[in-house]
């Protein structure tokens, strides 16, 4: 799940 959260952060930026 950490990977998904990290991807969301990357998209947010």
UniProtKB/Swiss-Prot annotation:
Top-rank taxon, per record: Bacteria
Protein name: Uncharacterized protein in pnp 3'region
Lineage summary: Bacteria, Pseudomonadati, Pseudomonadota, Gammaproteobacteria, Enterobacterales
């Amino acid at each position: 799940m950490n990977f998904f959260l990290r991807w969301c952060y990357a998209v947010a930026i």
